[in-house]
Amino acid sequence: MESKTLFLMALGIWLQSLTTTRGWVAADDRITGGRDFIDIESKFALRTPEDIAEDTCHLIPGVTESVANCHFNHTSKTFVVIHGWTVTGMYESWVPKLVAAPYKREPDSNVIVVDWLSRAQQHYPVSAGYTKLVGKDVAKFINWMAEEFHYPLDNVHLLGYSLGAHAAGIAGSLTNKKVNRITGLDPAGPNFEYAEAPSRLSPDDADFVDVLHTFTRGSPGRSIGIQKPVGHVDIYPNGGTFQPGCNIGEAIRVIAERGLGDVDQLVKCSHERSIHLFIDSLLNEENPSKAYRCNSKEAFEKGLCLSCRKNRCNNLGYEINKVRAKRSSKMYLKTRSQMPYKVFHYQVKIHFSGTESDTQTNQVFEISLYGTVAESENIPFTLPEISANKTYSFLIYTEVDIGELLMLKLKWKSDSYFSWSDWWSSPGFTIEKIRVKAGETQKKVIFCSREKVSHLQKGKASVVFVKCHDKSLNKKSG
C-alpha cells in the first residue's frame, strides 16, 4: 500500500508539471516596494468578490497610494491566504474558492492572497527553508499596515495551507503585536515535525491558533501533514489520516475509469481537505461540524469522548470557540466525503449477556436509528471482539439529522466465509438494554427490548429496541 501511495504521489506531481493556468506568475515579474521594503519578494494581492481568480491589484509595502488604489477597507476584517509548495509555480484550484468563502460570510472584509510562487516552486527542502523569508515578508507587510494606517491587528486572520501554515506562524511571531488568529490548514510535516517552535507554527504566534490535520498518514516526519499538535486547538477529522473519498482504492478506480487526468487531485485530496472543511465552515454557519477532545483516536472510535463539559467539544473552522488551554488539545470528529461535511455522532453501549464461553473476533453488525425527523438504516460497525457478560462501547454517525431518537434495530451479520459451526448452531447473546448518547445534543437515551429481553443471533433477523427511560438522562454528561 505504501508503494502505491508513493507511486500515485509521484504520478500526481508529474501530471501537475504538464498543466498550465492563467494564475502563473513569472519569477522576474517583480512588484517593487518602497525604499525600506526593497527586500520583500512576496506579493500581496487584494482580490475582490468580483474577481476571485486574478491578482489584479497589489498592496505594495511602503507605497501608501497602493492601499487606496485597491480600495482596502480599513474598518473590516482582513483574511490573509498563504499557499503552500507548488511543482508548477501556479496557484492551485482551491485558491479562488478560499477567497470567495470569506466574502460570502463577511462581505465587507479584505481577502489578501500572498504570492510566494517563485520560492514555493523549488525542491521541497529549499521551499521549506524559504518559509522563514516569506514569514518575514508577511510580518513586515502587516507591521507597515498597522503603523502607517493604524490598522488593528485584532482584525487580521492568517490562513496558511501546508508550508504556508508555517510561514503564517513565523509571520505571527514577528509582528509588533499579535494578530488575532492563525488557522493552520494541514501544516506540512517533513522538515517541521521535530522543528523548534520559532521555525514552525506554534500557539504563541497569534492570540488564537487553530489547526486542521487531515493527511498525517505515515511515520512522524514523513507524513505529508504534521502529526503533533501545534495550536491552541488541533482538530483531526476522521483521525487525521485519509479522508472519506480520498483513499488509494478510489484513485485506482478513477484511473481505470477516467484515465490519468484527475489522479493528481486524488493524490492531494486528503491534504487539501483541510481547506474545504474550513470553506464549509464559512458557507454553512448554521450547521458547524462539532469536534470532541480525546486522548487518542482509538478512544474516540469507541465513542468514549462525546462530552461537551468544560470545553471538551468545539466547532470546527470559522466559528470555533477560542479556548486557550495550557497545552494543546487534540480533538476528533467524523465527516462526510463532500460538502456539507457535518455528521451526527452517537456513542452506543451494549451489554452482551449469555453463556457462550468463546470470544468472537472482528464481528460485523448493523444498526438502524429512527428519529422524529428521519431515519438512518443499516449503519455498519465492527467490534474487534465480543464475549458474554461484557459491555462494549462504540461510535457510529449519521449523515442526516434524524431528530430525537425513538427506536433502533440491531443485526448481527453472518461471516463473509462459510462456517460449519455457525451453520450447525448460530451463536447468540441476550440484550436487555442499549444506551445511546448523541454528541451534538448531549442527550442520553436508554432503549429496551420490545420483548423485555432480545435474543440476538448471528445471521438472523434484526432485533428491535424502543425508548424505555426518560428520567434525568439529559443533564450535562460526564
UniProtKB/Swiss-Prot annotation:
The lineage of its organism: Eukaryota, Metazoa, Chordata, Craniata, Vertebrata. Disulfide bonds join C57-C70, C246-C269, C294-C313, C305-C308, C448-C468. Ca(2+) binds at A197, R200, S202, D205. The gene is LPL. Tyrosine nitration after lipopolysaccharide (LPS) challenge down-regulates the lipase activity. Belongs to the AB hydrolase superfamily. Lipase family. This is Lipoprotein lipase. It is a peripheral membrane protein. It comes from Felis catus. Residues 344-467 form the PLAT domain. Glycans are attached at N73, N389. GO terms for molecular function: apolipoprotein binding; heparan sulfate proteoglycan binding; heparin binding; lipoprotein lipase activity; lipoprotein particle binding; metal ion binding; phospholipase A1 activity; triacylglycerol lipase activity. It comes from the Eukaryota. GO terms for biological process: cholesterol homeostasis; chylomicron remodeling; fatty acid biosynthetic process; fatty acid metabolic process; high-density lipoprotein particle remodeling; response to glucose; triglyceride catabolic process; very-low-density lipoprotein particle remodeling. Keywords: Calcium, Cell membrane, Chylomicron, Disease variant, Disulfide bond, Extracellular matrix, Glycoprotein, Heparin-binding, Hydrolase, Hyperlipidemia, Lipid degradation, Lipid metabolism, Membrane, Metal-binding, Nitration, Secreted, Signal, VLDL. It is linked to Defects in LPL are a cause of chylomicronemia syndrome, also known as type I hyperlipoproteinemia. Animals exhibit reduced body mass, growth rates, and increased stillbirth rates. The modification 3'-nitrotyrosine is found at Y124, Y194, Y346. Key enzyme in triglyceride metabolism. Catalyzes the hydrolysis of triglycerides from circulating chylomicrons and very low density lipoproteins (VLDL), and thereby plays an important role in lipid clearance from the blood stream, lipid utilization and storage. Although it has both phospholipase and triglyceride lipase activities it is primarily a triglyceride lipase with low but detectable phospholipase activity. Mediates margination of triglyceride-rich lipoprotein particles in capillaries. The keyword Cell membrane applies.
